C-alpha cells in the first residue's frame, strides 16, 4: 500500500522543530546560542533520538553555539515534553547544517562562471 503525504514521524519531527525554535527564541537565556535557525529535525523510528539541524549567521562562533545547545539540551527536552505529548520524548542531538553555506558558495561559483562567459568574445 502506497503511503500518501506525510507520515506521522514527519509530522512529529516538524512539530518538534517548531516547538524547539520557539523555546530557543523565548525561553533560552544562553547568550552563546543567539541567532540560530533550526532547519530540520530527523527522528529515529522509535522517537528515542532526534537530530536537530541548525544554521547560524555567525559561523565564527560555531563551537560556542554548539556548546550552548548541548548544555541546554536537557532543559529544552524537558520544556518540549510540556508541549508535545508523545510516549517517548527524544533525546536531542544538535548538528550544524552547512547546506546554506554550501549553497551560497555554489551560487557564487555559478555567478563567476556566468561573468566569465559574458566576458569571453564569441566567434
UniProtKB/Swiss-Prot annotation:
Keyword Cytoplasm among UniProt keywords: yes
GO biological process: maturation of SSU-rRNA
Keyword annotations of the record: Cytoplasm, Ribosome biogenesis
An MF annotation (GO) of this entry: ribosomal small subunit binding
Compartment list: Cytoplasm
Function: One of several proteins that assist in the late maturation steps of the functional core of the 30S ribosomal subunit. Associates with free 30S ribosomal subunits (but not with 30S subunits that are part of 70S ribosomes or polysomes). Required for efficient processing of 16S rRNA. May interact with the 5'-terminal helix region of 16S rRNA.
Protein's name in the database: Ribosome-binding factor A
Amino acid at each position: 500500500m502506497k503511503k500518501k503525504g506525510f507520515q506521522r514521524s514527519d509530522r512529529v519531527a516538524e512539530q518538534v522543530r517548531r516547538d524547539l525554535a520557539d523555546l530557543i527564541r523565548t525561553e533560552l537565556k544562553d547568550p552563546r546560542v543567539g541567532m540560530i535557525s533550526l532547519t530540520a529535525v530527523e527522528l529515529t523510528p522509535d522517537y528515542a533520538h532526534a537530530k536537530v539541524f541548525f544554521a547560524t549567521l555567525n559561523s565564527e562562533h560555531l563551537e560556542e553555539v554548539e556548546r550552548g545547545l548541548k548544555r541546554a539540551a536537557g532543559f529544552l527536552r524537558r520544556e518540549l515534553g510540556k508541549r508535545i505529548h508523545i510516549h517517548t520524548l527524544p533525546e536531542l542531538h544538535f548538528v550544524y547544517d552547512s547546506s546554506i553555506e554550501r549553497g551560497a558558495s555554489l551560487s557564487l561559483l555559478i555567478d563567476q562562471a556566468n561573468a566569465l562567459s559574458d566576458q569571453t568574445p564569441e566567434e
